Amino acid sequence: MKTRFWSSDWIAGLTITIVVVVLTLGGSFDGLERAFYDWGVRSTDRKPSDKIAIIAIDDESIANFESWPWPRDLHAALIDKLTEGGVKVIGQTVLFVDPQRQAGMDHIRDLIDFFSTASFDDVPADIDALGAMLEFEGNSPAVKEILEFYLQSSINTRMSRDIETLKSRLFEAEQALNSDAILAESIKRSKNVVLAAVFIEGIPRGNPDAELPDYMLQNSLSEIRDRVAAQNKGLFPFSTVGALPPIPELGIHAAAVGHLNSKPDFDGSVRWEPLVLQYYDRFYPSISLQIAAKSLNLDVNEIKVNLAESVELGSLTIKTDSFLQMNTFYYSDNAGAPAFQVDSYFDVITGKIPLEKYKDKIVLIGSTATGVGTPQVTPINTAMEPVLTLAHSVSSILNEDFFTAPEWGLWAQMGAFLMAMLYLMLLMPRLKAGVAFVVTLVLVLALVATHYVMMTNYTMWVQLMTPGALLAIGYLLITTKRFLVTERGKARSDEESAESNRMLGIAFQSQGQLDMAFEKFRKCSPVDEQVLEAMYNLALDFERKRQFNKVTSVYQYMAKHNKGFRDIESRMNRAQKMEETVMLGGSGGHAGA
């Protein structure tokens, strides 16, 4: 009774369900869910924003300009051109976290410092004073002669001018080599450049070593609301302990600064983006959020954050997960055409592409050159450049194209688990194998179809693939268990049948019905030692009756199963000879008659 209880199908179904649930909680099926999530993203069709353009620092640009990193006056040149073309927002993804030192810059500054403290700076005034003194004492012939020499000499005619020219040239050289100042001036003139910063993730243990610069504090979010008791539940954006902001010379002139951090999934794929990061007691927006806000003429203080819910930009509501991450929508190519057109930096600088193309556009600048950036794995591309990922994020925000995991999604998953468990425990054991296969297949396909429809039609991600895996695994294991139980029963039945046939064969043999006995022995399976022993005795009975042809048949049958049993090989040879002798003897007697 106990054995039947533990071997019943409903216990097997319950056990399989418990094991799968435990594995799910441990993340064993996350890869399956992500694979179907990526499939849903690729299958969903939306139109990307036509306001976004990309200018790429590509291989052609680096080959035609200079090796990377470029002098920042080259970045300034592009910003100046785009400003001239009337762009709406410029999103610069190149990090400017350290001052750029051009070759010779330090020497020029040393010369300027030396010039400022040396006597050269006083020479023009001294020359003027000397001239005045000579003119005042000009009545003396000797002084008059010196005055005439002085007035005609280069001391009076050129030295002061040359010193001033040298001083001016030194300052011009410093300005020409100070690419940070050139870029800062371009950013200041443009008034619409959004720069990138990087935050260092970690858990704060105290207070920061130093406060961030004022221009970073001005880019922190102030409209923070908690409508779902997120603070009590510990639902905050990801925390950081350090930051790499743009250098002050650039940061103070930027229209906005946003973080460029990404949060890859466990398999390295970038499926979602943290729209907000927490730096101690302040919250900072992503660069995609800042770019979208600027394109809508919104300042950072007009970005509203609902903890564990969403981010609001004017009339736009970007729904997020509990950590303010947006499930980015990745736009697929349309008939071979990329979702976002990428132009070469070199082509824009040299005028091959008219600036009118970028009028009122959001222009994103970033690297696509080999070895410059690190490509990211996304649901639609295994090597997408970060500037392209940013384009998808900005478009997702502006179009409100993003995937969400609904609050009831967990309940739906639990309901699917319960359905699968009840099916495996109660219904499947009552079904025949073929019917069970069809029903299981229909249920799995129903879950897949539900997942697909929710993703493609409603941009909702409900994790139903693990319950589907439970159905498939449960069906395979329970079917395998049934097969093994059936095989074990069949083996037991075969053993019982073999014993019955062996006993019948012995009974027929004792009655002298040797042919019937041989027939029963041949039905025994498996042919073990007991059956071989019985057949050996049967062969001896056939020998005694001089039915050597049947003796040979018995031994041949035995040899197929165990050629080395006793002395059957020698007896079989002797029986064959005796059979031939009998046949020859019978033939000779007939001829003599």
Task: Locate the predicted segments by residue.
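Non-transmembrane functional regions of envelope-associated proteins
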Residues: 2-316, 358-428
